[in-house]
């Protein structure tokens, strides 16, 4: 006879005692709760966390993720000397920023000179860091690239060890990090910054560093200074031609909200019958432009074009558009401006955290807030210096 298989005894379902029936969530029943309580205890903490700790820049021009990365690199003595592996920087940053390595590396890439998203990059990079104007150009892994702080970062950390800003605990309370960086120039208007929070967003376009500094000095001397006379227009990293009128720009400067058009720059090569596009709007990519032009050709809306190629190389961006014989390049470009992202809009929403409160401000109000904050940094530095000298004087008098 075949041996009988031993059947394992089945476990009896756990019994719920009478006293456990009063445990909330143990019984399958609908718990009624006013929607106001749900918003207060569930939605609001999440929304405020995203607004304050993630998406909206502060008066120094940085989000927390940017600040943690740059301060870590400063602590690694990367303001001078040789570059180090990006993976080394990412690993060290995790002591202040409890995110994955991919998120931290993405932050570093977007601040790098190689990526080209900022007028004045903070990370001096070496290796393939991709390009801001390319959607499909992937950057190399952190183990292959190297980085250090760019020279301009000396102005971000000047006097940081002289009590110019507050230091707070990191996420586990084992390290200290600055709540703000004591930037000696209005970085909030120099470095382009974009963030999407819960119920609000921020979109700050960059301006010329020299113009911003001149405007700040003029405002300190005369609070009624005409800002448009010294800050002529925004300055975008990818170039292009800005299309706006004075009324539109004044509205942006006064309210912190508005938009303007940005048009690609191009040239015509008669010998080759080719249009070369060498600067594009900041808000689009070369792939998006090529895809749209190809779509127009297939639909028969751009019959003058025989081919389009992305010839971007180490010398810079270049889109080559081959024209058919007898085509007028001016008319072709006017059509492409109308139907493709070669002409795009740039939105402005100057939403900044001031003392933990999000505020949409115009350029004048934003610079005045920066001046007030910077004066406080200088005052704290002087008080620190006086205290150190007083201690030294006390010791000398004791001798």
Give the ranges of each region predicted by the language model:
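C-terminal interaction appendages of subunits in large macromolecular complexes
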Residues: 2-17, 26-30, 34, 194-196, ...
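Catalytic phosphate-handling regions of large nucleic-acid enzymes and associated NTPases
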Residues: 2-256, 318-320
């Amino acid at each position: 006879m075949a041996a009988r298989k031993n059947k394992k005894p089945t476990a009896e379902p756990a019994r719920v005692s009478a006293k456990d029936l009063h445990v909330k969530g143990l019984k399958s029943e609908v718990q009624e709760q006013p929607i106001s309580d749900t918003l207060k205890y569930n939605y609001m903490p999440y929304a405020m966390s995203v607004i304050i700790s993630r998406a909206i820049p502060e008066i120094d021009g940085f989000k927390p993720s940017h600040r943690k990365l740059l301060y870590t690199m400063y602590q690694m003595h990367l303001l001078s000397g040789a570059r180090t592996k990006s993976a080394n920087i990412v690993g060290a940053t995790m002591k202040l920023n409890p995110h994955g390595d991919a998120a931290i590396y993405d932050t570093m890439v977007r601040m790098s000179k190689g990526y080209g998203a900022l007028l004045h990059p903070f990370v001096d990079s070496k290796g393939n860091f991709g390009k801001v104007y390319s959607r499909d150009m992937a950057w190399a892994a952190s183990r292959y690239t190297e980085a250090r702080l760019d020279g301009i970062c000396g102005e971000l950390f000047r006097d940081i060890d002289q009590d110019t800003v507050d230091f707070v605990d990191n996420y586990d309370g084992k390290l200290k990090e600055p709540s703000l960086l004591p930037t000696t120039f209005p970085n909030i208007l120099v470095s382009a910054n974009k963030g999407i929070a819960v119920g609000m967003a921020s979109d700050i376009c960059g301006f010329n560093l020299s113009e911003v500094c001149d405007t700040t000095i003029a405002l300190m001397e005369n609070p009624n200074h005409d800002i448009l006379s010294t800050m002529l227009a925004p300055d975008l990293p990818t170039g292009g031609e800005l299309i706006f009128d004075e009324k539109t720009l004044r509205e942006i400067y006064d309210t912190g909200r508005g938009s303007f058009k940005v048009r690609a720059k191009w040239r015509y090569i008669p010998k080759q019958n080719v249009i070369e596009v060498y600067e594009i709007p900041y808000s689009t990519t070369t792939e998006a432009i090529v895809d749209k032009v190809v779509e127009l050709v297939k639909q028969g809306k751009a019959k003058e074009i025989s081919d389009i190629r992305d010839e971007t190389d180490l010398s810079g961006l270049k889109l080559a558009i081959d024209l058919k014989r007898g085509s007028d390049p001016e008319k072709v470009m006017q059509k492409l401006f109308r139907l493709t992202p070669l002409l795009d809009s740039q939105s402005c929403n100057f939403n900044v955290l001031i003392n933990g409160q999000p505020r949409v401000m115009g350029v004048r109000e934003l610079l005045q807030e920066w001046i007030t904050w910077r004066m406080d940094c200088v005052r704290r530095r002087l008080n620190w210096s006086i205290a150190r000298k007083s201690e030294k004087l006390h010791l000398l008098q004791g001798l």
